């Protein structure tokens, strides 16, 4: 259940440059409506089959921005482009090219964030720094998928200090890419319920909050 009091406490401390994205996977439409009523306009889902009924039911809320944060499957790419403004989990060149091609067919311009794997983690997908450097020339050629930033998820078990340092590496990487390529990366999607303060301190522009706002997953 959405907690207006927790949301109020969090939003009171957020810098104006940070956007709160409410993660509503497994949550009911009523929870999203409650969060909307409190002022949230950015909502994230990770499974297309779960997201579509919610997006359809809330179609009258025309100022909602839908964010896709789940693992991108090639056969679900079209539905993602059709329904989401932001795609946080662009994690390899092949899926980026496919999203761009579909977006061109649909005359859409979704905002894409490149998922970066800053530390070794076999459970996470994404580019390493070395892989991204190799793929940058091809990413610069994308026309309809607008690469607007980077996203990362940290492995569990890091200290607060190490989390902030690692998040800072994502900001440094974005700065380097902006200097070395034609991309203009302005968004840093980093920080979740357990580590968002460190992400904000390191320069996050989007934080993805679920459990802290809605309680544990069902």
From Swiss-Prot:
Q: Which residue positions does N6-(pyridoxal phosphate)lysine occur at?
A: 25
**Keywords assigned by UniProt, alphabetized:** Pyridoxal phosphate
The record ties this protein, via InterPro entries, to: Ala_racemase_N, PLP-binding_barrel, PyrdxlP_homeostasis
Note the superkingdom of the native organism. Bacteria
Q: GO: which molecular function terms?
A: pyridoxal phosphate binding
Pfam families in the cross-refs: Ala_racemase_N (PF01168)
The question of whether Nuclease is a record keyword is answered with no
Q: Could you tell me which CDD domains the record lists for this protein?
A: PLPDE_III_YBL036c_like (cd00635)
Say yes or no: keyword NAD present.
Answer: no
Per the record, its GO cellular-component terms are: cytoplasm
Which HAMAP family does this entry report, sorted A to Z?
A: PLP_homeostasis
Described function: Pyridoxal 5'-phosphate (PLP)-binding protein, which is involved in PLP homeostasis.
Which family does the record claim for this protein?
A: Belongs to the pyridoxal phosphate-binding protein YggS/PROSC family.
This one is known as Pyridoxal phosphate homeostasis protein
Q: Which organism is it from?
A: Synechocystis sp. (strain ATCC 27184 / PCC 6803 / Kazusa)
